[in-house]
């Protein structure tokens, strides 16, 4: 085996720290040299001292590590910005694990993966500093300007190009949109080069909005008329304050049924549940799909709602990775697809105003791949919600309100994948970015458990601010509810309800994150087999578990309840009692004079025991705002002329949403990503 120098060893060791390999294990690999094994025999490795590293989990995580010459002697983890009941609880265990492993080779803590990954990354930074080296893929230097979110297009040295690939279409990013694009091109006979900076196709969760089609026909939900579909499109335009393009929404709405049938075709083993809560056979537990809100709550009529949530959605369970990977495999099986995983596209190639290819860096070798794409390039690179500079520029309120990002996908260098690099690539090539971006921050209720499900979701029970005052019509969907919470003191409030909640839930709207079904189960084991309790369904055991965990407060009297939720503020306690009394009067009168909440969702809070759970700001799931586009997935220059050969799909496709994420169609972002990936593939190959 070839020996490596001590300098080389240290560099490799620091890089390995990022991926969890111990320094002593690396030293053992350098056999034949007494000095090379000194890591396990006491040779100095570190510069003694205390070092600090930071990384982003739910919020900023700080790790401070103290080193002797040969060991990590102390670890301090500051997870105060994490969810207290999740990341905060995990911190002591993570400290012990780092000390025991003497590296970042530690197991993830179930339910606290985001915090664990952040701690590992911050700890790796400490190790790098102590060893006096730096590895690629770290955070951008703090000294760079926050305004410099676009950066400068790199110059690629042709001498570093180790491989040249000639194809019809290059696809950048293998999420839902990119995978759909690959399959679309390949099945039409085009040659595809697929670039992805992670180690394979990427996806999260599994909700899709689907209008009509064979899949929806399985549940009799394929009966949407032209007029109803156009009403859905109108609602979307209103929610986006008419800052998006109707043509994009319309083409999707009228064609998604057939496209979704094509998508699930790739997964012939997919099991179709009869209802939202049907039992699932053991052999199908890892690959099934449910209709969301089927059957609908008995009192829900979307036609009568001020904020309708249309019964169009389905969800892949436990998530959609089986279907996404099946689609990618179906594309590869055509023989027309080359995949380049772990490769970072750094520059588009433009000739006479047309996009004709790209340069990508292979993370494994540091060398470049030049891809000539005769028909064009499809950008499907996702959003930018882990890029603080871009957030500050495009959605400053996300930063101002201290909204934390929920995103766990990482590239092969250990960094989050959603960095907005597609926007940078496109803008360097002359494309324009849309205005009025839409952060997805729909509230799912207070007192969330490890799965992110709130105690009663965002169901419209009474809500009081930190002074004990009522401040809104509580009959709001998650996004609008979040907007109201952000306006309150400390951006917090209390949801309050009484023991009659089981009778009241069926009157709540079937909407994003809201509890609207009651189930009388004593434990999850009593529920449908292999179909864990869905977020819109609530049973008494769940509420009592929330009380036991401290995620909800319970009291026999209202006086006791307000004393618990406002423990050091007697003025707030009295104001809260007055607010509840006023609310009860309005409920009994049948008309909400204060906030015009529908009488059908106003109930007096008067039968103990009483409950409360705290609302804080929700998490940012994705920040939707991309390059200006249209229903053919084109991009546009500063004069709004089409840029030939440059297409977009997924979150990088602009003008789908604007201002804020709409709540009328659960899973519409996934659905439009898949559909327009399909469209982009066909259009690129045909040069449309």
Task: Put a short name on every predicted segment.
Residues 1-20, 24-27:
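N-terminal secretory signal peptides and thylakoid transit peptides that target proteins
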Residues 252-367, 388-389, 586-607:
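Conserved redox-cofactor binding core of oxidoreductases
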């Amino acid at each position: 085996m070839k020996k490596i120098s001590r300098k080389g060893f240290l560099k490799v060791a620091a890089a390995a720290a990022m991926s969890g390999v111990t320094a002593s294990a690396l030293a053992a690999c350098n056999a034949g040299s007494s000095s090379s094994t000194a890591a396990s025999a006491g040779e100095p490795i570190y510069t003694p001292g205390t070092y600090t590293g930071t990384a982003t989990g739910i919020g900023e995580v700080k790790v401070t590590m103290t080193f002797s010459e040969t060991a990590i002697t102390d670890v301090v983890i500051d997870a105060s910005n994490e969810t207290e009941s999740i990341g905060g609880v995990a911190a002591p265990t993570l400290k012990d694990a780092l000390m025991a492993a003497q590296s970042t080779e530690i197991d993830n803590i179930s339910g606290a993966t985001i915090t664990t990954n952040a701690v590992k990354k911050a700890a790796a930074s400490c190790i790098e500093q102590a060893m006096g080296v730096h590895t690629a893929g770290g955070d951008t230097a703090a000294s760079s300007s926050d305004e410099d979110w676009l950066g400068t297009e790199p110059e690629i040295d042709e001498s570093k190009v180790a491989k040249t690939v000639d194809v019809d279409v290059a696809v950048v990013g293998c999420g839902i949109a990119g995978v759909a694009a690959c399959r679309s091109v390949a099945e039409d006979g085009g040659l595809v080069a697929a670039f992805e900076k992670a180690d394979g196709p990427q996806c999260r969760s599994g909700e899709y909005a689907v209008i009509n089609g064979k899949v929806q026909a399985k549940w009799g939900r394929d009966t949407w008329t032209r007029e109803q579909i156009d009403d859905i499109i109108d609602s979307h335009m209103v929610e986006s304050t008419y800052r998006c393009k109707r043509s994009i929404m319309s083409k999707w709405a009228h064609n998604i049924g057939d496209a979704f049938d094509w998508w699930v075709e790739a997964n012939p083993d997919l099991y179709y549940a009869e209802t939202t809560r049907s039992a699932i056979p053991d052999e199908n537990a890892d690959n099934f799909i449910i209709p969301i809100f089927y059957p609908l709550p008995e009192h829900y009529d979307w036609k009568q709602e001020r904020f309708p949530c249309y019964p169009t959605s389905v969800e892949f369970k436990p998530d959609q990775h089986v279907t996404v990977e099946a689609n990618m495999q179906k594309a590869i099986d055509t023989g027309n697809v080359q995949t380049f995983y772990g490769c970072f596209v750094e520059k588009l190639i433009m000739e006479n105003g047309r996009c004709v290819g790209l340069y990508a860096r292979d993370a494994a070798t540091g060398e470049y791949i030049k891809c000539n794409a005769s028909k064009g390039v499809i950008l499907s690179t996702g959003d930018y919600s882990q890029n603080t500079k871009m957030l500050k520029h495009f959605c400053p309120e996300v930063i101002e309100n201290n909204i934390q990002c929920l995103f766990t996908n990482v590239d092969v260098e250990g960094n989050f994948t959603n960095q907005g690099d597609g926007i940078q690539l496109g803008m360097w090539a002359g494309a324009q970015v849309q205005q009025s971006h839409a952060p997805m921050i729909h509230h799912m209720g207070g007192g969330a458990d490890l799965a992110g499900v709130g105690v009663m979701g965002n169901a419209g029970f009474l809500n009081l601010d930190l002074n004990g005052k009522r401040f809104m019509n509580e009959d709001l969907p998650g996004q609008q509810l979040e907007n109201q919470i952000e306006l309150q003191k400390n951006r917090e409030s209390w949801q309050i309800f009484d023991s009659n909640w089981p009778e009241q839930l069926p009157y709540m709207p079937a909407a994003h994150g809201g509890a609207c079904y009651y189930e009388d189960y004593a434990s999850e084991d009593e529920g449908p087999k292999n179909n864990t309790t869905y977020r819109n369904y609530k049973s008494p055991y769940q509420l009592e578990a929330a009380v036991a965990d401290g995620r909800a407060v319970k009291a026999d009297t209202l006086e006791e309840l307000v004393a618990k939720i406002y423990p050091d503020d007697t003025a707030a306690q009295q104001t809260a009692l007055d607010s509840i009394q006023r609310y009860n009067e309005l409920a009994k009168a049948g008309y909400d004079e204060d906030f015009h909440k529908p009488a059908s969702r106003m109930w007096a809070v008067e039968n103990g025991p009483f409950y409360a759970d705290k609302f804080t700001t929700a998490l940012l799931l994705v920040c939707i705002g991309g390059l200006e586009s249209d229903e053919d997935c084109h991009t546009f220059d500063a004069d709004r002329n089409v840029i030939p050969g440059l297409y977009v799909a997924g979150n990088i496709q602009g003008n789908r949403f604007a201002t804020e994420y709409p709540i009328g169609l659960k899973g519409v972002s996934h659905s439009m990503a898949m559909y327009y990936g399909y469209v982009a593939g066909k259009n690129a190959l045909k040069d449309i």
